[in-house]
């Protein structure tokens, strides 16, 4: 059986990870998750993509919202609102317990990897979810007027300001998770997550970037674009604002130095020749995942 490493963001990546979890032995699956979205809020360390993956794989996610836990209550947030506290980032009561426990574990001296694995055990999951790095890397969104932290852009401002660039802070002190030996994986999968803010933070980490470049024949990309639109999140909007065509060809060009195989949706079959010309082995299937 092959060993797979998934490079994963939030909702779209989590759906693919769930498919792998349900299809192969957990011993053959590792999921490295973007932590560029992580931030400290109300004194708590919050890891949105790690939590989305963990909740999804534990069948605990709120599928109607695409984030948070199912059967959630909001007593803390309601009480905080009455105190005129910060409520722009919505924390449900059960979700809050995750952030409290993570923060406690990290403050007790655990690495983010160890804290993540402790949380996985609480959700009866194998220890196959890893943060991309144990060092902090923070994604910022450059707009025309100012630089925004990712959560300020994504949640507080609802992705409204036009994007001009991306900035990743902390790269001088960070690298890909040292607990993951890239040479042990037969295939690396780039999940259908936002290439700019979910996958690109990982590609900035030298250990991973160099490995993908040298072993691109072992790397498969799953397109997050289907029929000229993104199924989740602001990927298509960002492409347009950056002056890029919203297409699988743009995705292929973005990953061209790191991947030699790509899966595209059957609605994009007309793009196959252009992807072949870029050097890709193209696979066509139905990419929309319902879970």
Regions found by a protein language model. Give the residues of each.
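Short Gly/Thr/Asp-enriched flexible loops that form oxyanion-binding sites at enzyme active sites
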Residues: 17-21, 198-211
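Redox- and metal-dependent alpha/beta enzyme cores, enriched for Fe-S-associated oxidoreductases
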Residues: 203-242
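A short helix->loop->beta-strand "cap" motif at the edges of active sites that frequently abuts
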Residues: 25-27, 214-219, 280
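C-terminal functional extensions of proteins
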Residues: 232-291
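Short internal beta-strands
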Residues: 30-34, 217-225, 261-266
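Active-site glycine-rich loop that binds ribose-phosphate moieties when present
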Residues: 164-182
């Amino acid at each position: 059986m092959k060993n797979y490493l998934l490079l994963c963001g939030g909702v779209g990546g989590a759906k693919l990870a769930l498919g792998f979890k349900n299809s192969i032995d957990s011993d053959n699956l590792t999921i490295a998750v973007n932590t560029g979205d992580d931030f400290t809020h109300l004194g708590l360390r919050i890891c949105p993509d790690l939590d989305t993956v963990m909740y999804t794989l534990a069948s605990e996610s709120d599928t109607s919202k695409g984030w948070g836990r199912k059967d959630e209550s909001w007593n803390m947030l309601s009480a905080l609102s009455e105190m005129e506290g910060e409520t722009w980032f919505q924390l449900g009561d059960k979700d809050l317990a995750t952030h409290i426990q993570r923060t406690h574990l990290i403050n007790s001296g655990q690495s983010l990897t160890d804290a993540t694995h402790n949380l996985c055990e609480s959700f009866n999951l194998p220890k196959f979810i890893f943060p991309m790095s144990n060092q902090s890397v923070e994604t910022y969104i450059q707009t025309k007027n100012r630089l925004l932290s990712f959560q300020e852009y994504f949640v507080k401002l609802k992705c409204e300001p036009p994007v001009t660039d991306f900035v990743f802070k902390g790269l001088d002190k960070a690298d890909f998770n040292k607990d993951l030996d890239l040479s042990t994986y037969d295939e690396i999968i780039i999940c259908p997550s936002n290439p700019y803010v979910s996958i690109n933070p990982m590609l900035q980490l030298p250990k991973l970037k160099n490995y993908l470049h040298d072993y691109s024949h072992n790397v498969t990309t799953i397109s997050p674009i289907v029929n000229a639109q993104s199924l989740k999140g602001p990927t298509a909007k960002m492409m347009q604002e950056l002056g890029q065509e919203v297409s699988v060809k743009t995705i292929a060009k973005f990953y061209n130095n790191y991947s030699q195989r790509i899966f595209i949706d059957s609605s994009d079959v007309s793009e196959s020749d252009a992807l072949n010309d870029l050097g890709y082995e193209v696979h066509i299937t139905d990419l929309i995942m319902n879970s």
